[in-house]
Curated annotation (Swiss-Prot):
Homotetramer. It comes from Influenza A virus (strain A/Silky Chicken/Hong Kong/YU100/2002 H5N1 genotype X3). Glycans are attached at N68, N126, N215. This is Neuraminidase. Intact N-terminus is essential for virion morphogenesis. Possesses two apical sorting signals, one in the ectodomain, which is likely to be a glycan, and the other in the transmembrane domain. The transmembrane domain also plays a role in lipid raft association.
Length: 449
């Protein structure tokens, strides 16, 4: 091979190597560009987020909360939650609230509450002793947490409310508007599905605790009319947020307000407040067709406040100290009854649970169990029932639970505001203890001085 041929051969080989190297570099650049494009696309893919925990939402299988089981047998009450919202609110951003209540789905329990459109220790908390204003809204947060703008979910505009879960979605009922023409707005999964207009034009109001769901239908009780005389009371049956049936109670000489309702063996029992003339609590029980029975808890262990000292009860309204009242609850077990009540007979202070083994039908004042919840030297307030379904607990029965509102501020304390925290307990058939779980906040706040 002469020198010219060698030069041509070496040059050709170098050119081939250069071309191959160039092609490999181009391929590498294309590969990097494609990989980068895929990663960038994934980073910018829109994902829905929750407004409470900022985690990507995952599809959750729905169930039907049957409500066909009986209440679990219990021997006492185990502490379930305490939010300490007034103590935390002296320094943190916590809503001014009242009328808190708890309701559970098959996945979680949430605290619902009526805000005043204001925060504790802020100028807008002034005058929040008022029950009904256009600023009041129903909101919710995880149970046991202090309700704040950072963990709470808006539910409805309301100065009276109820909420419950049927196994698929949350139903909320929010009443707002003028006293002589308020409207209840029903929402299902956050979407308005129906409305109920005041039919007596006299402060339409509802439970201030959870509604009750059985086999996909949910039930609530509403009142319209005088708070100190005969009013009108209706039971509503709702499916997916729409009213499918309602019945007005034929209940002369009865007074029902702020009912605490729960399912038991496929039927609903509600224990309510008589603000007219009863120191004992009226009840209404009904089936899924709204066929109902009415009565008063007969026990001589009286459950309302104010009330007389325990004595001889009645299966009708007990008149002494019967005017006014406070929201409360009881759980029926055959002829027996667990009664929740304030310790004081004339002020909203203290709280206790009493087991009267024949108090649903018997009029004596004997009882066999008393469990302390709040000392008589500490403020309490409203109380109400809620339940945990077997789909949540894994039990073969419906667990009874209750919450107690711990009101602070006006009218009993020297502040410019009225608000409250809450505690809750659930029934168990094991060891429990009586104690005092008070609100515990030191008042007044800076804004009050």
């Amino acid at each position: 091979m002469n020198p010219n041929q060698k030069i041509i051969t070496i040059g050709s080989i170098c050119m081939v190597i250069g071309i191959v190297s160039l092609m490999l570099q181009i391929g590498n650049i294309i590969s990097i560009w494609v990989s980068h494009s895929i990663q960038t696309g994934n980073q910018h893919q829109a994902e829905p987020i929750s407004n409470t925990n900022f985690l990507t939402e995952k599809a959750v299988a729905s169930v039907t909360l049957a409500g066909n089981s009986s209440l679990c047998p219990i021997s006492g009450w185990a502490v379930h939650s305490k939010d300490n919202s007034i103590r935390i609110g002296s320094k943190g951003d916590v809503f001014v609230i009242r009328e808190p209540f708890i309701s559970c789905s098959h996945l979680e329990c949430r605290t619902f509450f009526l805000t005043q459109g204001a925060l504790l220790n802020d100028k807008h908390s002034n005058g929040t002793v008022k029950d009904r204003s256009p600023h009041r809204t129903l909101m919710s947060c995880p149970v046991g947490e202090a309700p704040s703008p950072y963990n709470s979910r808006f539910e409805s505009v309301a100065w009276s409310a109820s909420a419950c879960h049927d196994g698929t979605s949350w139903l909320t009922i929010g009443i707002s508007g003028p006293d002589n023409g308020a409207v209840a707005v029903l929402k299902y999964n956050g979407i308005i599905t129906d409305t109920i207009k005041s039919w007596r034009n006299n402060i339409l109001r509802t439970q201030e605790s959870e509604c009750a769901c059985v086999n996909g239908s949910c039930f609530t009780v509403m009142t319209d009319g005088p708070s100190n005389g005969q009013a009108s009371y209706k039971i509503f049956k709702m499916e997916k947020g729409k009213v499918v049936k309602s019945v007005e109670l034929d209940a002369p000489n009865y007074h029902y307000e702020e009912c605490s309702c729960y399912p038991d063996a496929g039927e609903i029992t509600c224990v309510c407040r008589d603000n007219w003339h009863g120191s004992n609590r009226p009840w209404v029980s009904f089936n899924q067709n709204l066929e109902y029975q009415i009565g008063y808890i007969c026990s001589g262990v009286f459950g309302d406040n104010p009330r007389p000292n325990d004595g001889t009860g009645s299966c009708g309204p007990v008149s002494p100290n019967g005017a006014y009242g406070v929201k409360g609850f009881s759980f029926k077990y055959g002829n027996g009854v667990w009664i929740g009540r304030t310790k004081s007979t004339n002020s909203r202070s203290g709280f206790e649970m009493i087991w009267d083994p024949n108090g649903w039908t018997g009029t004596d004042s004997s009882f066999s169990v008393k469990q302390d919840i709040v000392a008589i030297t500490d403020w309490s307030g409203y109380s109400g029932s809620f339940v945990q379904h077997p789909e949540l607990t894994g039990l073969d029965c419906i667990r009874p639970c209750f919450w107690v509102e711990l009101i602070r501020g006006r009218p009993k304390e020297r502040t410019i505001w009225t608000s409250g925290s809450s505690i809750s307990f659930c029934g168990v058939n094991s060891d429990t203890v009586g104690w005092s779980w008070p609100d515990g906040a030191e008042l007044p706040f800076t804004i009050d001085k």
